[in-house]
Amino acid sequence: MTIDANHYDVIVAPVITEKATMASEYNKVVFKVARKATKPQIKEAVEKLFDVKVKSVNTLVRKGKTKVFRGRLGSHSDNKRAVVTLEEGHRIDVTTGL
């Protein structure tokens, strides 16, 4: 089992929110992923980096918000999240890191 450097480019960061923490009770983990990452790439990266079996991957694109900063309009970038469902008996503790 070799870890490719591209796997680190696919998974950007874990998402630690109240909703993501509640999803962990159902064997689901939420990651912020690269915009161009596909579901098979995300599945392979999670399986190799964390040594777990992935059951399914669902992705969503969150649109960036428009904000006012110092009287000027600006915007946050769009970002992509992946909700990864793990097989029974597999766990990922996102607080430990890679």
From Swiss-Prot:
Keywords: Ribonucleoprotein, Ribosomal protein, RNA-binding, rRNA-binding. SUPFAM superfamilies: Ribosomal proteins S24e, L23 and L15e. GO terms for cellular component: ribonucleoprotein complex; ribosome. One of its GO terms (molecular function) is rRNA binding. GO terms for biological process: translation. It holds the Pfam family Ribosomal_L23. It comes from the Bacteria. Part of the 50S ribosomal subunit. Contacts protein L29, and trigger factor when it is bound to the ribosome. Belongs to the universal ribosomal protein uL23 family. One of the early assembly proteins it binds 23S rRNA. One of the proteins that surrounds the polypeptide exit tunnel on the outside of the ribosome. Forms the main docking site for trigger factor binding to the ribosome. This is Large ribosomal subunit protein uL23. It comes from Nitrobacter winogradskyi (strain ATCC 25391 / DSM 10237 / CIP 104748 / NCIMB 11846 / Nb-255).
